[in-house]
Amino acid sequence: MCRLLQIIRECGLLEDLQRLPDGDLSWVEPKGDNLSGGQKQRISLARAVFQNASIYLLDDPLSAVDPSGRQKIFNQVITSDKESVVILMFYCSCIFSFMIYH
């Protein structure tokens, strides 16, 4: 599986892409006006992960994502990279319940 497709799946974007009329070639309005807040956050996270950086600074990257999506993305994306430093800032204590075990 290509790396981009893997990141799209891990960030929970595959279903969103499949629903768009032209898939990954669909036009996104400037500033993402035709996307939900959760979609914008998941796209931003996917773009960051695709960069394959050694350090990530993520400011509340899952606040607009639904609760089940938060945990899945946190487990598959944020905690899976053992070689990078990930600095997270959250403003919602609900994140801590599944974060404490990582």
Q: What name fits each language-model region?
A:
Residues Q6, K40, Q76-V77:
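Short coil/turn segments at secondary-structure boundaries
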Residues L45, I73:
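Hydrophobic anchor residue at the start of the ABC signature
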Residues M1-W27, N52-S54, G69:
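Conserved "ABC signature" C-loop
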Residues L14-I43, P61, V65:
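ABC-fold ATPase nucleotide-binding domain signature/coupling loops
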Residues Y56-D60:
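Catalytic Walker B motif of ABC-type/P-loop ATPase nucleotide-binding domains
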Residues Q76-I100:
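Conserved catalytic loops of ABC-family nucleotide-binding domains
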